[in-house]
């Protein structure tokens, strides 16, 4: 006959095994959560990609429909400093014909001076900053920040989810072979929320892209969205520095840009830590991050090997 003490002793190893299994399970869950949250060894990206694939399966095939075309921008001629027009010749008193009043010589305008410029349209970058809610939501976050600067949106998580929830209205296979967000979908989203006129532009050179972005930013007072990390990420450009005003001097060199990076404050295992909103990214950082479009999912004939930007073309009136 088994004693009570013997039964208690026989249960102890079983309880210890259960506790050990429970401990390993909890540690595993916590470790997986930490890995996804911090993107350790790319775990966060893998998790988000898995979720995106499930969403894609549920949504069905990517629609093959027309969308906003990518505009190939020709380089602006690098001319010297602006020159004054030659004055119109006055009438010759000795010339035949009836006398007439001489045409007055126009007053020459002063030649613009070539001086460095520092432009930043976002007075308070933190007030319009929105962190992307998942590893793959940089596009809706950048759309949100652009709209927030224009007074057309807030920076709440709810609004970002709302924007992303409408992606099926705008996605197109030619814009993104994987579906979901491409630059054309971003332009359509901006238009849907009151910021029309954004163009998807492609450039041969980085300086050419940054100059055109700077000119558009000055002319419209609206941010530019740069397609960074070979087209895998987005930065919102709210200003720039240059050795001259690019709107006047076509050969002005852009030395960097003021950026809102929706990835902040996350750290990428490939690209490193991101920077706070409004950070000036100098030339070296632009060379490291703003790279030619090159996507692994397939070819994009009008974008591959080019620098891509989403550029404003019209002045957007602030919302009442």
Please provide the spans of the model-predicted regions.
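Conserved active-site-adjacent core of cysteine acyl-enzyme catalytic domains
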Residues: 2, 6, 23-71, 164-320
């Amino acid at each position: 006959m088994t004693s009570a003490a013997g039964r208690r002793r026989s249960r102890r190893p079983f309880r210890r095994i259960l506790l050990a299994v429970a401990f390993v399970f909890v540690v595993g869950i916590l470790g997986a959560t930490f890995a996804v949250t911090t993107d350790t060894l790319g775990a966060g990206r893998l998790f988000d990609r898995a979720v995106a694939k499930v969403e894609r399966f549920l949504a069905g095939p990517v629609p093959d429909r027309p969308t906003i075309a990518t505009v190939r921008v020709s380089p602006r001629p690098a001319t010297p400093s602006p020159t004054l027009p030659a004055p119109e010749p006055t009438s010759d008193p000795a010339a035949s014909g009836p006398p007439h009043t001489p045409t007055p010589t126009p007053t020459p305008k002063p030649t613009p001076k070539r001086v460095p410029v520092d432009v930043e349209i976002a007075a308070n970058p933190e007030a319009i900053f929105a962190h992307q809610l998942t590893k793959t939501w940089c596009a809706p976050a950048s759309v949100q920040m652009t709209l927030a600067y224009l007074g057309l949106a807030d920076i709440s998580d709810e609004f970002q989810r709302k924007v992303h929830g409408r992606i099926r209205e705008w996605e197109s296979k030619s814009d993104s072979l994987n579906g979901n967000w491409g630059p054309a979908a971003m332009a359509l989203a901006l238009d849907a929320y009151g910021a029309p006129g954004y163009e998807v532009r492609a450039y041969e050179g980085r300086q050419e892209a940054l100059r055109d972005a700077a000119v558009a930013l000055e002319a419209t007072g609206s941010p530019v969205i740069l397609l960074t990390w070979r087209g895998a990420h987005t930065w919102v450009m709210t200003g720039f520095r240059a050795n001259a005003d690019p709107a006047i001097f076509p050969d002005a060199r852009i030395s960097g840009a003021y950026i809102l990076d929706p990835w902040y404050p996350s750290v990428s295992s490939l690209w490193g830590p991101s920077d706070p909103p409004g950070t000036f990214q100098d030339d070296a950082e632009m060379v490291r991050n703003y790279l030619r479009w090159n996507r692994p999912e397939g070819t994009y004939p009008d974008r591959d090997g080019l620098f891509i930007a989403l550029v404003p073309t019209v002045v957007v009136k602030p919302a009442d």
